[in-house]
A protein has these predicted regions:
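Hydrophobic, aliphatic-enriched repeat segments that assemble into extended interaction scaffolds
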Residues: 45-59, 67-84, 128-131, 145-155
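A structural signal for well-ordered alpha-helical scaffolds and beta->alpha junctions
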Residues: 31-34, 68-72, 181, 185-186, ...
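Hydrophobic alpha-helix immediately C-terminal to the catalytic Tyr-X-X-X-Lys motif of short-chain
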Residues: 33, 37, 41, 71-75, ...
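Catalytic helix-loop patch of NAD(P)-dependent Rossmann-fold dehydrogenases
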Residues: 1-58, 62-68, 81
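Amphipathic alpha-helical recognition patches that constitute DNA-binding helices
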Residues: 25, 66, 70, 74, ...
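Short, structured secondary-structure boundary patches
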Residues: 14-17, 71-74, 223-225
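C-terminal substrate-binding subdomain of Rossmann-fold SDR/epimerase-dehydratase oxidoreductases
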Residues: 81-239
């Protein structure tokens, strides 16, 4: 929801200060409309809606679908499958493919078909290929901590706590929920490789797009209200 060229880390007050990322504009506008609706209801009718803006989430029951998943669960699954291939553990490969078929190929498909579809997604016994240079920075929050932060906000925060008393214009009263810490995609992939125990090669295909180079929220407002995250990315990946 924040502007394409917003200063990093992104504070709540940078909302609507410059153009949005063009490819993400409709999605961002829909979210911003929800934030503004809550804010306006509070100001006009005295309601007590609190809007929050989470960073990238990961955790239990994540989406590991190679065709549609986000970066972290996609990397975990790719490296896990490559490790299984490297170890010759076809029982684990077939179990994984039965749980989450890829383009119609499942664990009951012929071995050659499974290997071919995995290669299409950069997965082989000797190598895992990921898109981009690996240099973009991203922030990740354990999903259960998002739930914890949301409950904390509902129980301990009121609308009047989200802006400075005496402000002429009351706006951007939402609260960022994040860690305020970032990691490169390469570092993240290397952590996953280490955790899984994969002994193959990790390759980045720089002919593919990197996406936005940096996305980091500033959670200082939430910190001032009394909530801090506890689970770091290393522990989250192990879980």
């Amino acid at each position: 929801i924040y502007p394409r060229d917003a200063e990093q880390p992104m504070k709540e007050e940078v909302l609507l200060t410059s153009p949005l990322e063009y490819t993400n504009e409709p999605y961002a506008i829909a979210k911003i409309a929800g934030l503004k609706m809550c804010e306006s209801f509070n100001l006009q009718y005295g309601t007590n809606y609190i809007a929050v803006m989470p960073t990238n989430l990961y955790g239990p029951n994540d989406n590991f679908d190679l065709e549609r998943s986000h970066v972290l669960p996609a990397m975990i699954r790719k490296i896990h499958l490559a490790h299984c291939l490297k170890e010759g553990d076809w029982e684990a490969v077939r179990k994984d493919m039965n749980q989450r078929p890829v383009e119609g190929i499942n664990g009951d498909s012929p071995k050659a078909d499974i290997l071919n579809i995995l290669r299409k997604y950069g997965i082989s016994e000797t190598e895992v290929t990921l898109w981009g240079t690996g240099t973009p920075l991203r922030e990740f929050l354990w999903s259960e901590e998002m739930a914890d932060a949301s409950v904390f906000v509902m129980e301990h925060v009121n609308f009047k706590d989200t802006y400075k008393e005496g402000d002429k214009d009351i706006r951007n009263c939402h609260i960022n929920i994040g860690t305020g810490k970032e990691i490169t995609i390469r570092q993240l992939a290397e952590r996953i490789v280490e955790t899984v125990g994969y002994q193959g090669k990790l390759t980045f295909d720089s002919s593919k797009p990197d996406g936005t180079m940096r996305k980091l929220t500033d959670p200082s407002k939430l910190h001032s209200l009394g909530w801090h995250h506890k689970i770091e990315i290393e522990e989250g990946v192990r879980r």
